[in-house]
Amino acid sequence: MTTTDHTHDPALQSWVASANAADTDFPIQNLPFGRFRRSGSGESWRIGVAIGDQVLDLQLAAAQPGWAADVPPLLAPLAAGDLNAFMALGGLARRTLRLALSRALAAGSPQQAALAPCLVAQGAVELGLPCRIGDYTDFYVGIHHATAVGKIFRPDNPLLPNYKWVPIGYHGR
């Protein structure tokens, strides 16, 4: 995806009041997935979506009515607690579910009554590693980051001359 869609509209509001606060990290335009469980519960890890100061429990949300026909198969791996399986479905699946979640959490959504009981306060959860990370290569491309790190090793010359012309990648595991 090279452009943003209407789920990123700055004017979009949520029925989750805390998601509309100017200083929130998780407005309706930013719906990150994560792995959580209720603090001290010892229950199984679940996949959720942060919204305002809440987490939408996708295991509970998947069982609620009102989803379009193409959404339950996308929620199934998340309801089972498997973010890797969901990511393996590809970009179209992610965009489709993002749109469905945005509509469901938007102000005036007919799903509000069904989904409100699926919210858990972020302050009442503990977070876990969201997925199984097998391998990765990191590309060192942020000039501000590269400058800050370079100052640690070479305070007088933080960026080497080739930085802007030669991609720098390294194995991260």
Name these PLM-found stretches.
Residues 39-44:
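Short, solvent-exposed loop/turn segments that connect beta-strands within catalytic domains
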Residues 45-49:
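Short beta-strand-centered aromatic/proline hotspots
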Residues 2-4:
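Helix-enriched interaction subdomains in cytosolic or periplasmic regions
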Residues 6-38, 50, 57-173:
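Active-site microenvironments in enzyme catalytic cores
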